[in-house]
């Protein structure tokens, strides 16, 4: 219906509306710190523009890795080498959990959002340590048996007044940032007969909440799903590995990937793996999002693909179009993964001068023990250097292929270095552009691996290694003690 007001009056009414909105916003910002009105106002402003603007001053921590590049590098200078020894305890807050806590807190204008085990979300006033609200998704406790590595959660996403959390039992929940009340909830698990879990933090890119999953040890097929941040409507889904080749593939990327698997292994029965349970980054200028994919299901390469093959897109960095979820490029860090060498560890986007040329790169330190520099415009391999003891490969050739050692794929017992815990795991990584240094914790826990010749998917055979846990590895773990010198350090 057309307006009957004269144009001049329409303009006056429109201007009045804008002024009224501005006054309401100012009043909300002037509300007492930590009040629902204050929280609603400051969190409503968190969007793509705010996250990018904050990266230049880092007054807040509005996104999982601080910024879209996930540098985790604060530009604040209030704490330095000269006064760090003066820091002391101001307050404590009880997360009410005796289980693992792996979350990165988000902080906006003094309001902290942090998760604990069982996907419980806490909103805390950092000025006082006072609880503002908490949200418990009531994950059934028996669901714990479907997770490999505790009922942890790595954090939330924040966008336009909402807090988004993935729950251990596979739901994605949108909460009102001011009250903790549920706005919408979606089940992200496409097949409830499979033991999918969610432990990673969602990311919000261009109004879409993107979440992956875990469960490769138990036999699942990995995928990412994007949901509309406002309504929860599913926008796209991208699988990391191909499904049953007897059925049509979802896209050309899956058809291409299937050629790198051997159907004799019936990988689709055991899921294939490749779950995205952690790292996602985004380059607004290139309009590309980057994801790291997980290990194979089962672990044993011979079991899932007897004739070999790279098994795309396991243990890879993959670039996707965030608008559509379409595949753009990939670089596989561990072709034919045989050791649980996931590539889901944190990745950082930065620009480096290499051979006299400025290049847009990804910095990545995955489980396999090599530190990678990859061109993020096209996936071209630049370099890979070991950052810890490594015995499965001596290095990478100029084409970006690992130079494997003969014993790495032996059928006999073999000390895997790094072991399945990885040289670097879920622990945060950061980059200081001033020093040009990347910082991340390194570990080395060698594990003895041997082929489980009697393995069958979900056999649950009494006395068979790992069978009672529901794990589908095709491997025996520490059937004999590791002898590597790194063991026990």
Where are these regions (language model features)?
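Bacterial N-terminal signal peptides that target proteins for export
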Residues: 2-16
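Bacterial N-terminal signal peptides
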Residues: 13-26
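Blade/loop signatures of beta-propeller domains
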Residues: 32-89, 245-255, 401-402, 480, ...
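Repeat-blade elements of multi-bladed beta-propeller folds
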Residues: 61-65, 100-120, 145-171, 195-218, ...
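N-terminal cofactor/phosphate-binding cores enriched in small/glycine residues
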Residues: 70-189
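Extracytoplasmic beta-rich repeat domains
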Residues: 93-104, 134-157, 185-201, 239-279, ...
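Hydrophobic or amphipathic alpha-helical targeting/insertion segments
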Residues: 126-131, 154-188, 193-240, 376-381
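Beta-propeller blade signature
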Residues: 175, 222-233, 310-325, 374-379, ...
């Amino acid at each position: 219906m057309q307006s009957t007001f004269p144009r001049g009056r329409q303009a006056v009414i429109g201007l009045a509306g804008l002024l009224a909105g501005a006054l309401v916003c100012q009043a909300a910002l002037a509300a007492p710190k930590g009040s629902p009105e204050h929280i609603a106002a400051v969190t409503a402003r968190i969007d793509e523009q705010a996250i990018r603007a904050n990266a230049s001053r880092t007054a807040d921590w509005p996104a999982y890795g601080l910024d879209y590049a996930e540098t985790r590098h604060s530009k604040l200078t209030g704490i330095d080498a000269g006064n760090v020894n003066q820091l002391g305890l101001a307050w404590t807050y009880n997360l009410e959990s005796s289980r693992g806590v792996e979350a990165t807190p988000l902080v906006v204008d003094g309001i902290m959002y942090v998760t604990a085990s069982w996907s419980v979300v806490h909103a805390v006033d950092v000025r006082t340590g006072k609880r503002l609200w908490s949200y418990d998704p009531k994950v059934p406790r028996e669901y714990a048996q479907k997770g490999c590595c505790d009922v942890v959660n790595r954090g939330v996403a924040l966008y336009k007044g909402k807090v988004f959390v993935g729950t251990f039992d596979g739901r994605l929940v949108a909460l009102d940032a001011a009250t903790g009340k549920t706005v919408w909830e979606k089940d992200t698990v496409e097949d409830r007969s499979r033991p999918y879990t969610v432990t990673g933090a969602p990311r919000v890119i261009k109004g879409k909440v993107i979440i992956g999953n875990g469960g490769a040890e138990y036999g699942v097929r990995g995928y990412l799903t994007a949901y509309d941040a406002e309504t929860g409507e599913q926008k796209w889904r991208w699988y990391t590995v191909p499904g049953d080749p007897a059925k049509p593939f979802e896209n050309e990327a899956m058809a291409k990937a299937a050629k790198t698997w051997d159907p004799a292994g019936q990988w689709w029965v055991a899921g294939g793996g490749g779950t995205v349970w952690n790292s996602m980054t985004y380059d607004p200028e290139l309009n590309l999002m980057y994801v790291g994919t997980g290990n194979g299901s089962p672990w044993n390469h011979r079991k899932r693909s007897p004739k070999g093959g790279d098994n795309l897109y396991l243990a890879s960095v993959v670039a996707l179009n965030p608008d559509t979820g379409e595949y753009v490029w990939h670089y596989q860090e561990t072709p034919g993964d045989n050791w649980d060498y996931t590539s889901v560890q944190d990745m950082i986007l930065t620009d480096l001068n290499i051979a006299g040329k400025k290049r847009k790169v990804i910095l990545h330190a995955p489980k396999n023990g090599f530190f990678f520099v990859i061109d993020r415009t096209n996936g071209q391999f630049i370099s890979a250097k070991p950052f810890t003891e490594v015995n499965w490969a001596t290095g990478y050739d100029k084409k970006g292929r690992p130079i494997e050692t003969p014993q790495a794929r032996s059928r006999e017992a073999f000390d895997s270095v790094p072991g399945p815990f990885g040289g670097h795991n879920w622990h945060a990584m950061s980059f200081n552009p001033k020093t040009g240094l990347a910082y991340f914790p390194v570990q080395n826990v060698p594990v003895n691996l041997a082929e489980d010749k009697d393995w069958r998917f979900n056999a649950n055979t009494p006395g068979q290694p790992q069978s009672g846990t529901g794990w589908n590895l095709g491997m025996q773990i520490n059937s004999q003690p590791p002898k590597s010198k790194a063991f026990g350090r």
